[in-house]
């Protein structure tokens, strides 16, 4: 309903108003400042395809979050640039299972940096910080495929038999 939509600033909700964002996750480059300086950070996610990044960065490519990043790259850079990046990625990156594992490896100095969702570091920092104390986050700039933000949203189906309950849940 309109009251629920008004809780979210206009620039962060769809104009048609059929759903609303509930949570957002940013793609970031987590890095270990003891291994890499701010001046050495990749300016773009696309930079990780360059030879100087071989063996220095990690990701968890089997997750839906990473697949969404590739979809964003397709939309922003096109099929050929995405294919070229994926081929270089296969050569350059170290695969880990899960964003937490990537962050832990960066924290331990096993790898210089990695592509993860931002909240993995924030959750760890809110607890002991044990798996992120040696890390920092770098946010890629606007219009870069690495500046991907994933939204979890909700809406009430027109065919719903429980519209009031669904609306209350979303509020």
Predicted regions and their residues:
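A bilobed periplasmic-binding-protein/Venus flytrap-type ligand-binding module shared by bacterial periplasmic
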Residues: 30-35, 149-162
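Short beta-strand/turn micro-motifs at beta-sheet edges
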Residues: 17, 139-145
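Extracytoplasmic ligand-binding site segments that recognize negatively charged/polar headgroups
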Residues: 1-111
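Short amphipathic alpha-helical coupling segments at ligand-binding clamshell hinges
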Residues: 81, 85, 151-152, 161-171
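A ligand-binding cleft/hinge motif common to bilobed small-molecule-binding domains
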Residues: 113-134
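Loop/turn elements at helix/coil->beta-strand transitions in domains of secreted/extracellular proteins
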Residues: 53-56, 109-112, 132-135, 164-166
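Short, flexible turn/loop "capping" segments at secondary-structure junctions
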Residues: 21-23, 145-149
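Small-molecule pocket liners
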Residues: 25-28, 70-71, 135-137, 150-154
